[in-house]
A protein has these predicted regions:
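Acceptor/aglycone-binding surface of glycosyltransferases and processive sugar-polymer synthases
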Residues: 1-69, 94-104
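Hydrophobic helical membrane-anchoring modules
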Residues: 2, 38-43, 64-136
């Protein structure tokens, strides 16, 4: 992927060839809704996958403030990348351990999205007004 010029690669369940295995429909709907909310801010179809690879230069010096487990959202919004690719993968439910999904995580995710949308709007507003955008 890096050889093809991408600065960021995201493993995605929501591109052709990707998917989920052994998930209840309710979890599929929650995941789809979470990604639908994030897409206007990130442009990425599976912003919640948690599997990503990026060039170091994309995030060096970038101030991140992750709330909960979704640090990828911070990088997708604040990172300095020109091109990204989504690579298909099939997610299966864990065999050992406990899921990180709780209602507290849902609240943290929504708080983080609101914060990142504010960041995006602030950068857009600064560019629209003709000033140089603030550094992250």
């Amino acid at each position: 992927i890096v050889q093809r010029g991408a600065d960021l690669a995201v493993a995605s369940r929501h591109v052709p060839g990707g998917g989920v295995k052994d998930w209840p429909k309710s979890r599929e709907y929650i995941s789809a809704f979470a990604n639908l909310l994030a897409q206007p801010c990130t442009g990425i179809h599976d912003a919640t996958s948690g599997f990503f690879l990026m060039r170091r230069s994309m995030v060096e010096g970038v101030a991140v403030n992750p709330i909960g487990f979704k640090i990828g959202l911070e990088f997708y919004v604040k990172g300095r990348y020109r091109r990204y690719e989504e690579v298909p993968y099939v997610f299966t439910d864990r065999r050992h351990g406990k899921s990180k999904f709780t209602w507290r995580e849902v609240v943290n995710y929504l708080r983080q999205l609101v914060s990142l949308m504010g960041y995006r709007l602030g950068r857009w507003w600064t560019r629209w007004r003709g000033a140089s955008p603030a550094r992250s």
